Amino acid sequence: YGYDKNYNVTSVTDPMGYVAKTVYDKDNRVTEETDALGQKESYTYDKDSRVTSITDKRGFTTGFDYDAHGNIQVVTDKTGLKSHLEYDKNDNLTKVTDALGGVTTYGYDNMDNLVTFTNAANKTTNYTYDLEGNLTSIKDPAGRTEKFDYDEKGRLTGHTQASGKKTTYDYDKLNDLLEKSYQDAKGETSEKDVTYAYNSAGERVSMKDQTGKSSYEYDALGRITKVTSGSKKDVSYVYDDADNLQAIVYPDGTKISYEYDLNDNLVKLTDRNRKVTTYKHDALNRVTEVTRSNGTKTEVSYDAEDHITKIVNTCGSCGKVISTYEYKYNDQGYVVGETATELEAGTRKTPSWEDWYNWGDTQKETDKADCEHQEKEIQTTRTYEYDD
């Protein structure tokens, strides 16, 4: 670790030698963070040390305005669009109006527990609690209810799904889960109980279910190093100095190995047959390229909101593009258009189809067009509906 004269941590060098840096202002507030790859995020503050803006690794800035109680009142995104937030007298968030005018509301009881949530489509979910503030039920917009039971220590002892299926839980004196039992809607046992055992450090050392018993071993850092299944065969786990999983070793001696970049992103995977898959990432740690052992490559593009906009698959042996998928989104982040083009095996013709979606206020597609058949392309429009 490195420090400034005010004893703020200014640099961290991990066991692999990678360095992350932090810059502070005269009031010891973080103003800039730089990761091991040199990517930066910066922050500004008001006179009350509240964050007023965040500029991310892409250079996009999000701004924040506050009310008299210090609650975030306005959020301004990178395009200048604003979302407005409202609160009750206890500073509970009660209303969010997004940049498109969509309204989400929240309701609370006298204990400040959330009891209603109404989304922008005017669909409401209801919540109830016991006197200790434990969540006892959730009723979704379709009227389906799931319930929760607790013991005197506030530990979850039962969960009943809307279908009537129930799972019960039993604990030891240290609050470790000892047993899970299952019942169907008629109250009859539906699956064999699952039991657990722990060591003095609270680490789970065994589990017994309908498939048999499995045992677990750990290293000094609490990382699992070995799993022994009911067949008495061991699977071992190896880690690098940055705590990333480096290898899984199987009873027959084969293994899966993993390699990572400075930001702990997976960059190479070698499977049990020694076939290699490699991965590339952008500055935001998003996967941008996957190359498989046969040379087949997948390239992925994103927009500023992290939506996938394009996927291109390329043949490893011939180098030709074998499929392309493009996506368009509306301002609410829902897919409104999909274009897919694939190379047809054997004939080398390229059938294409394009799907366009019209989302209603409840995010259900409302329009459907005719299917038009052409000599080389098939163009269709699909419609989808979603439950609550």
Predicted regions: what they are:
Residues 1-14, 18-35, 39-56, 60-77, ...:
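Beta-strand elements of repeat-based all-beta scaffolds
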